[in-house]
Structures are given as structure tokens and as C-alpha cells.
Amino acid sequence: RSTLFPTRRSSDLEYVTTYMVPLQAVAQTEGIVVKDEAEYVDFLVSRIGSKKIRNICYFEVNDCNPLNAIEYILEDGQPFFDAVVLFAGNINWDASKQKVYMKANPNVQALLDNSEELLQPLRKKGIKVLLDILGNHDQAGIAGLSDWGCEQFGKELAQICLDYKLDGIGFDDEYSSYYGSGKWFAGPSSQQAARLCYETKKAMKELCPWETWVHLYYLGYIQSSLPSVFIDGVEHKPSEFIDNVCADYGGSARPVNGMGLSGCAGNSIQLNYGYSISSSGAKALMNQGYGWIMWFAFDPSGTGTVNNNRSHSLRQFRNVAEGCYEQSVRDPKNVYNKISEGQYDPAPHPIN
């Protein structure tokens, strides 16, 4: 029981705020005794978002500071973005050490090394933060690792999520040469792409004490037709180890086996190319059952090599908010800048 907030309703609670409610356990049944150390409990409560369709944004981190996501808020206080994907880390082959590893360029590494000030503010607002992994012009690739190689690389990615407090991994099958030799490699196939997803999800669940996702960008061997993975004769459908998927620019993603449309992005909108969406189009996607809209290359600052696309992007965000949530997006007050290679400014700067 608690007498601190006797009339507080769930609708009174703010989004992205955690409330602590002190509770006292009182035994109502004769013969039942509550131990002193168990009598008082602090119960944490937060308001769950009401969106039927959510927003996932790929940030080109070579150009843009991902902290910009926190400035875009619905009128009811919910963040407009539900997940951010850091684009991107790479899967690479280290010839000297004879191993596959995750290579981070100076920008990705700076975000990871400064996670507390550059990434954790997003998570504290209820926005998931994922690291995307794609090929980098050598024999290592998302779809070309042996079963053993998938297990080893999956464990490395899970450790990265734990060390830097990330919410999962995205996979994007681009720019790999494939056809390496040795114990790390297998011929590229959708089967091996599925196995890497399986091993990564398994390792994250074992290592991270929070919910983690495997997210897919459909390209190359990564498609909706990914097969099941069989371990010791037990079938694991893709829906068991893949949480959400998106298509390439302008497309609608089809679900992997066992997944519904709620795990799929109904549109992939490249903001730097001027892609757009209407309020009626967004509502139609929601009514069809799609659970996500993907945004790519949002950059409200223009402090990298990409021009500021804030005005165009905000119009599209508001179209989605009006069509799907029957409200608008508040005017953003600040912008977060990228300073130079490997440097991001954690401080907000007022929009002129």
C-alpha cells in the first residue's frame, strides 16, 4: 500500500520519467509474517508509450551528432524517435591476429568511448541505441562466417553492447568481398547470415542484463527469406532472434518467418535525398499493421559534410505525428553539433 499518491492516475504521469513509489507489505492472513527486511519496497513506475507505429532513425555519425534525436518530442511528451541506429561500425579481418573483429572508425569510437555523455542521454529519454555493423571491403562479411566464426563474432558484439551500454546490433550486408579461407569463414549465404543473427542475439541475452535487439536492414544476403537456424536438431525461426527489420530507401519491409508486420518498417525515408511521407500515407501504414517507420540521414545541424535538412525533416515528422498520433511535434529548441572527426559536442546550442 502507498499513501503518497492516492489519487495519481497513469494518465497523470509524465513520459520518460521514472517514479518511485514506496510500498509497505502488510500481512492480511493470520499466521503469515512479513520479515522486517522485506516489509518496505521501493516500486519503480514509468508510463508506457502509446504509439502503434514507432520511429527508428539511422544517424550518419560521420556527419551528425546523434544527440539531436532528443530534441524531437511529441506534444504529449513522448520522444518522437523510439530507436537510434549508429551508422556504422564494420566487420573486418585482422590478418596479423587472424581473426574477425568489429572495427570502429574515429567517429564511432568517439561515441562509444564517450557513451555516458553522447549516448546514455538518449537511453534515459527512452530511446534505444543500436550499433549497425556492415562490411568494409575485405573477406569478412555478415553472411560469410562459419558457425564457429558467427559464435565468436556474436560474442564480441554482445560484449560491446555490455561495455558501452547499447541496446542491440543492426546488420547491413554491404561492401564485403567475401570468400575468405580458414576456420572463421564459410561461403556467403543467407543461412550464415541467419546464424550470425542467432549467435548475436543469444550472446546478448546471456551477457546484457537489459533487453537487447537484433535489427536488420534488408540488403545483400539479409532478406525476409532468411532461413531458420537448427541447433542440436531444434529449429529456431528467425522471429526468435530478429526483433525488427527495415527495407532499403523507399521500400516496405516484409517480415521474416514467424514475425508479424509489427516488426517491420512500412517505409524507409532518406531525408537527405528529400524523401517525404504524407500524414495520410503514414496513417495507412499504421492501419495496415506496420510497427515502424525508418528514417535515414537526419541532420539538423549541418556541421558535417551534409547540409542541414532540419526544416524538411521536421515537416515529415509532423506529418507522421498528425497521421498516426493525432498530435504534432514540438518546435525543437536546440541543435547538437559534430565538431570534427572523432569529436562531438555534448552541449545543446539554441536554434537561431
Language model: regions and residue ranges:
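Generic N-terminal initiation segments characterized by hydrophobic and/or small/turn-forming residues
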Residues: 1-2, 20
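Secreted glycan hydrolases and related glycan-binding modules that recognize and/or cleave
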Residues: 11-352
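Short, small-residue-biased leader/transition segments that mark boundaries at the very start
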Residues: 3-10
